[in-house]
């Protein structure tokens, strides 16, 4: 049996450091929090190669006395608590006394620190946790820590670090949250010699949001200041017409500490329930101020997760506070458009995807109900009314200006559709699975053996949403949005693989503001975006100018679509392969570009939809897997009528 031995201090420190120092961002977080606890109002963070080569944090805080600087690197040495009861009234960000010791044990660390009462600073170097040198030097009041060669003595841990871009993203997220929690502190983040984030330190949260996320977001927020019982909720929340398609913009602080807790997300999302499209999330920056005894920050090694003793009450307070602020916006046109995007007749519609992405109608469509509201002219550049593309035999797509066809009936039957038997493939559509397309390998190719069209003639529409058609064996109900989405999707995939996507220049270029990590991701995808029809140019530190977009995107939704495409890139950047991600974006754009529920089609347009649908590789499911066609057989009709 192996003999039980006490581990050497250096080994114990390296093992313990694994809980505190997971990656470069962990180092940045601990050092910045020490700077904040030291009363700093100016903090410089300098990073090289995502923090793998160098991390520097310099502040103007109160500094460390020269006779305490070595003790500061002993494990469990801290100035923030003295006994266990202090944990229940904790006001500092750090308290365990593990951070400096853990960081020093897995790196080469230099520290220069000076207090106000000292005439000279003290400079000390540590390697693997051991003091190598210590000497006086000249420096201003505050602390300057430089960490080099992180994990130099633990190569197994270094091997698991991600790419420079990924590691920098984590660092930027840390600094973003600390800056939002402390708007009175001037933060500067430099990566590879370039300033990527800088906050003004004015003490105003909205100024900080503007500096990090840009003007558009800052102007789309409303202030919240609510107190109930022992909890105060303050910060900013988004109007219902401004949202994102992931939760990464729901940012919470408890007593100015950035935290994660699902109860906070639920409180926010329940307050916005019914106000946002399906799959959309609000943008919130909320700080909860409550008695420290009601929150346990010691449940996670990195202190990013917390536990509440009154979680249900906290959720209710958040929800009530947001509800009150949103209710004040009831008379705002921006809010009304989001709460009631559909006409009165649309209330009974299925809660399907096309409602989520319904766009504002043109004035002509609203005022002239007898006109064709669906097919508009496609022009270049995008300075005309919105366009909807439909298939034609000649060139794959055609566009048409509003016609004067009455909605009460279709035009005379145009016998363009073939009267054929139902294809066996249709009978097997229940076994169909959602497309899995390898874009890089051009797996979508033209269907040489065109499917027979199992439909004789178009009869009409139901609620301007479903095409009703007669076939050789009963009735066919076709979802016009899903059908058009399938047509656009296959055309887009084929054109993408052949680099044939048509772009249209914007009369007024769209400015997109991003955070520093978003900018890094976006730059890496610029070639793929250009191939998809988006022409973006870097414009400033973390902003881009969109000069061209794919022709199928409607003019009035340009900025929204581009923003949502970027959100999808950021959300799935690491979760999907590049080909899968591009496929996801093309599916999304096809959905946004397709005819919507509630749009009137004349008979010819409905026929064109059906004809184009059966030229695709799979006319029975849209790219997201939703059904396109419902078949009611003649036998089913006869049975329902009591004839069988």
From Swiss-Prot:
Q: What is this protein called?
A: DNA mismatch repair protein MutL
Superkingdom in the source lineage: Bacteria
Compositional bias segments (type: Basic and acidic residues): 343-356
SMART domains the record matches: DNA_mis_repair (SM01340), MutL_C (SM00853)
Q: What is the role of this chain?
A: This protein is involved in the repair of mismatches in DNA. It is required for dam-dependent methyl-directed DNA mismatch repair. May act as a 'molecular matchmaker', a protein that promotes the formation of a stable complex between two or more DNA-binding proteins in an ATP-dependent manner without itself being part of a final effector complex.
Give the classification, highest ranks: Bacteria, Bacillati, Bacillota, Clostridia, Halanaerobiales
Q: Which UniProt keywords apply?
A: DNA damage, DNA repair
Q: Name one GO cellular component term.
A: mismatch repair complex
Cross-referenced HAMAP family, in alphabetical order?
Answer: DNA_mis_repair
UniProt cross-references to InterPro entries, sorted A to Z: DNA_mismatch_repair_CS (IPR014762), DNA_mismatch_repair_MutL (IPR020667), DNA_mismatch_S5_2-like (IPR013507), HATPase_C_sf (IPR036890), MutL/Mlh/PMS (IPR002099), MutL/Mlh/Pms-like (IPR038973), MutL_C (IPR014790), MutL_C_dimsub (IPR042120)
Q: What PANTHER family would the database entry show?
A: DNA MISMATCH REPAIR PROTEIN MLH, PMS, MUTL, DNA MISMATCH REPAIR PROTEIN MLH1
User: Could you tell me which species this protein originates from?
Assistant: Halothermothrix orenii (strain H 168 / OCM 544 / DSM 9562)
Positions of the UniProt region annotated as Disordered: 336-356
